[in-house]
Amino acid sequence: MPVEGAIPQLAGIDMYGNSIPAGTVGGDLFEYINFQQRYDIDGRIARALKLAKLYLDPLPAGQPARNMVDDHVCWLENRLNHEPSTPLEYRKAKSSEQLRIAEDLPELRTTAGVLLVDAQGHGLISAKIASTVHDTFHALMLVELDRYGKTTPGFFEKINLRLAQSVTARNALGRNPKDSAREIATMLYGEMRPEGLFRFVNFGHPPPLVFSNEFGTFMEIGQARMVQFPPLGLEIPEDHPDRNKYFSISLRKRQVNSSDVAEITLMSPGDILFLYTDGVYDGTDDEERSQLERVMRNHKDHPAREICNALLDYAVKRDEHLQQIGEDDVIDDKTVFIIKRR
């Protein structure tokens, strides 16, 4: 079940998700990010406009700094040989940042976010890891909206670093540095727009599938459009200043940037975006893909809720068969999220 938040209402978009744990608790977590419900967008716009004006106002003589801009201007003015125009130029730059935030924030009114997390396993530890990703996500989202008025690539890099194992913590636990065993969590976060554009970042999660209403099949999506990083915390960028403080399976050449944000567009009414965790489909079995495609075809004209539930019902029946043949160990938590263009 979603952690928090009502289903966002976007013109021309129908969405619904659900999750079934394999045990009492599970490592799957999904959440609707309803920006209008969670954040006071009008209040944030008003604050940004207020700060844009305040940052231009000189600090009265003898008064303490009112904000970080005042603080930095004081530092500039105390430096030897500083250019007299530098403090004013700095104030103008910081003011313009707030004006841009005020311009970007209104777009959140017509944006719906979706967060999917899959922590390896389906017990208490897995649930705790998924919860850590969730809590980190929302803490950093507050920072993003304060600083930029939208999500940026650096947001995802910070979440990735939070899930990495630090050298200090590993040593404190007495773990062998050569022991590669660790808890794994994948994450997919995307934002949907009314025109059918879905922009997302993927850390180790099975790639989305797109079902064409016209052709009744899953469409092939070029791999070049489906950027995917390893699961959270496994790969630290080599240009990150703290890279030596974390264990990393490999070093990435650079930090996440805008070119790593993948895009999928639902072109026609009835087209469906299918997000899922590997308890439903691991993204590799062609026969399983065909079965899911059949379920999708049989329910494609139904609302997103019914499509989601039909896919989960299929996955549960498949699990019942696995139990009958003694393969309980491959049963995992199941999450399905459907986004349909009306």
Language-model features and meaning:
Residues 14-15:
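Conserved N-terminal boundary motif of the eukaryotic protein kinase catalytic domain
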